[in-house]
Amino acid sequence: MEQRKLKLRDLTLRDGQQSLFATRLSQAEIDKLLPYYENAGFYIMEVWGGAIPDSVMRYLDQSPWDRLRIVSKAMKGKSLLSALSRGRNLFGYVPYPDSVLEGFYKEAIANGLNVMRIFDALNDIDNVRESIRMINKLGGIADGAVCYTVDPKPEAPAEKKGFFARLFGSKPAEPEKIFTDEYFVEKAREMERLGAKIITLKDMAGLVTPSRAASIISKLKANLSVPVDFHTHCTPGYGLASSVMAILNGVDILDTNIWWFGGGSAAPAIELIYVFCQKLGIELDVNMQAVGEIRDHLLDARKSLAAFDLNKDKMPRNFDPLADKLPADVDACLLYTSPSPRDRT
């Protein structure tokens, strides 16, 4: 049986630095990393969009268009380059007319962009419809992102007065759930029908639990014919576990960062995903030696961002999964808690 391969989208140069370091990574620091990225073999690299254009112009006095062109030239087509778009709001904060959308997407693709991840924070399909259509028309890859969220907790009822009122009072009915698995599947199917070539479950707040990641990803895989991507953050502490559950349930692409830009309020580190995939018999479709070279240089890049690094005094120790050994108790725990191949079918 052929070993399963998991494709990766590297977020380090966009979402990683935005989540941890206020999007202040300079072009000079990025230029030092690009020769190593060329050989890493990431399926997709997210390098643009989100807060990048605003921050690059506002705080670094640099051109976001230059950044896209420089990265595209350096990568030589070896990884697809992606950006994050707020649908009708593009990279801004107000809705734009169709003429602006089309002109912007045309220039983005002409300057080296391949994949546009398109989302609306309220999952309003009308706000992503034209973006998906235009990206496809212009020769790009439309990545439809379904935003994950949870139902609000019902307010506690007012305390009833008196012993018998509290004893015999009826319990208020639970409100009907809105954000069910079926809700996310239907939003994904709508985007697929519009022409999205990738569907992402986008958990930008890190709210999706491991069990919920498993149930939603398995249903997306059963109901879609396009690749499924999983995006989460480690803010509450279980982003890594949720990512592993997404892997176990057949996700095609996983979003990760490289060590010094991973974890915390960012996406999980690829190095830890690699450890779990080794235990599970799943191959990462990436050159981990090249990833190690990027990691070595990323530490200097992180040090250059000390003014924006809330954890500069308590950074994790370096970890090279190709050379370092996990502590025996941790390694045994991973071995005995990893599902068997039979469990993964």
Write out the residue ranges for each language-model feature.
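Hydrophobic faces of well-ordered beta-strands that scaffold small-molecule active sites
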Residues: 8-11, 45-47, 79-85, 116, ...
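Conserved, mostly hydrophobic/aromatic
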Residues: 16, 118, 199, 250
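Active-site beta->alpha loop and helix N-cap motifs at the rims of alpha/beta catalytic domains
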Residues: 49-129, 146-184
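Alpha-helix-loop-beta-strand connector modules within alpha/beta enzyme cores
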Residues: 58-82, 133-144, 214-230, 280
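Active-site-adjacent beta->alpha loops and helix N-cap segments on the catalytic face
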Residues: 61-65, 121-138, 181, 206-220, ...
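Catalytic cores of alpha/beta
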Residues: 238-249
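Glycine-rich phosphate-binding active-site loops on the catalytic face of alpha/beta enzymes
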Residues: 252-266
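Conserved small/polar residues in nucleotide/adenosyl-binding loops
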Residues: 336-345
